[in-house]
C-alpha cells in the first residue's frame, strides 16, 4: 500500500480509504467487521465516516456506522494505527 502525508500533521494515510456509508443499514456489524479486517490486511489505515451514516439517513440508524467502527476498533485493539475522517451534516428535519 502506498501512504501519503496528511497535510502537515505528521500522519501518513493510505492512498485508498475505506468508505463506510453502508455500515449499519445495507451491511450488518459482522459484514462491516469483515470489510474492516480486509481493509486492514490490505494496508488501509484511513476510514471515511459521517454522523449521518448509514445512508439513507433515518433517525433510528443515525450514527450507527460510527458505533460499528468504534466497536471494531475496540475489539481489534491498536486504535492509534487508524485515521478516521468524519463529517457533520447538522440539523435535518425529522432527525435528532
Residue ranges and their predicted role:
Residues 1-83:
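N-terminal binding-site loop/beta-alpha segment at the start of enzyme catalytic domains
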Residues 53-57, 91-96:
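A short acidic, helix-capping loop that chelates divalent metal ions and anchors anionic groups
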Residues 81-92:
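A short, structured active-site edge motif that brings together acidic residues
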Amino acid at each position: 500500500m502506498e501512504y501519503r502525508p496528511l497535510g502537515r500533521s505528521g500522519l501518513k494515510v493510505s492512498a485508498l480509504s475505506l468508505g463506510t456509508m453502508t455500515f449499519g443499514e445495507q451491511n450488518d456489524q459482522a459484514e462491516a467487521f469483515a470489510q474492516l479486517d480486509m481493509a486492514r490486511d490490505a494496508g488501509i489505515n484511513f476510514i471515511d465516516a459521517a454522523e449521518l451514516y448509514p445512508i439513507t439517513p433515518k433517525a433510528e440508524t443515525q450514527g450507527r456506522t460510527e458505533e460499528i467502527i468504534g466497536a471494531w476498533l475496540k475489539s481489534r485493539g491498536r486504535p492509534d494505527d487508524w485515521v478516521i475522517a468524519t463529517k457533520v451534516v447538522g440539523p435535518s428535519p425529522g432527525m435528532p
